Regions:
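Hydrophobic anchor at the beta1->P-loop junction of P-loop NTPases
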Residues: 2
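Conserved lysine of the Walker
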Residues: 10
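Hydrophobic positions on the alpha1 helix immediately C-terminal to the Walker A/P-loop
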Residues: 13, 17
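Conserved AAA+ ATPase "sensor/coupling" helix adjacent to the nucleotide-binding pocket
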Residues: 47, 120-125
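ATP-dependent NMP and nucleoside kinases share a basic, alpha-helical "lid"
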Residues: 72-121
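Small-molecule kinase domains that catalyze NTP-dependent phosphoryl transfer to phosphate-bearing small molecules
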Residues: 94, 123-166
Length: 166
């Protein structure tokens, strides 16, 4: 699993690892929304993590991002069981995963760089920067209380990659 704050490079790293291991990726963006920073976990745990750990296919309803806010659920997805699956997204290496993950990776970058990456990601909309700043404060509080970074098996700093131009 790849955890870390928004804009840190989790998705980029997940794609690299997925390609290397020929493993599917489950994105936490299918569960989280701007209004649901950390409360998505019970649905993910029941529909995905517990199911896959039991050796069964995971069937879950993905978040609908067509309104840019992720305020509703959309299509149903099926992730066939696989010996290796990359789970990528904010707070996915939270305390509740202790003893349930093979490997936890913490991905990080300075806050200013993460915000800049967030501003070039996706489409522009009024209030985007304020949403990102609020989200980053929620992340800081969650990660401090959860002690997520200190439980990681490895820490990857993606500062060297800068801000994407496209």
């Amino acid at each position: 699993m790849r955890g870390g704050p928004s804009g840190s490079g989790k998705s980029f790293l997940a794609v690299q690892i997925s390609t290397l291991l020929d493993a599917p990726i489950i994105e936490i963006d299918d569960f989280v929304s701007w209004d649901c920073f950390a409360g998505w976990w019970p649905r993910f745990d029941a529909q995905v993590l517990t199911t896959l750990l039991a050796g069964r296919d995971a069937v879950y309803q993905a978040r609908d991002w067509s309104d840019w806010y992720g305020s509703s659920l959309g299509e149903w997805k099926t992730q066939p069981w696989s010996a290796t699956i990359v789970v990528e997204g904010v707070t996915c290496t939270r305390r509740q995963t202790i003893g349930r993950l093979v490997y936890a990776v913490w991905v990080q970058a300075p806050a200013e760089l993460r915000l800049a990456r967030g501003m070039v990601r996706g489409r522009a909309f009024p209030g985007k920067e304020e949403l990102w700043q609020r989200w980053m404060r929620e992340e800081d509080a969650f990660f401090a209380a959860d002690d997520t970074r200190n439980r990681a098996d490895i820490i990857v700093d993606t500062s060297v990659f800068g801000v994407p131009t496209a």
